[in-house]
């Protein structure tokens, strides 16, 4: 057995958003969970000025299973399209299985944000930094 520190569980981790081929109208989100999450969804809303988010659009994600020395994990990917250019969106992924037998809907993680690119004639700037390895929740938000 590998290090149990890196074992996947029902809480999503390794959440990564990437621009689509047309960064003005789409993006993709990938994340990892344990094998109990078998109907993953992503929720998406236009990020507004109000704490109320309205009714989110739900996007079904695809899932690939990876077997490793730490057991099986599910790697999910949701492709989002049909978005408006130069618009800030909020998205989130489920913390537990979307539907857990006998428990109804699962809970959702925190809202993350993604801004689509402007039109094709506008220069696009990206910020990239590598894997921080440690203190992701306490230090990374300070960079962003």
Question: Where on the chain are the PLM-derived regions?
Answer:
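Alpha-helical scaffolding within the catalytic cores
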Residues: 109-113, 137-144
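Acidic, histidine-bearing metal-coordination/catalytic regions of metal-dependent phosphoesterases
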Residues: 1-128, 133
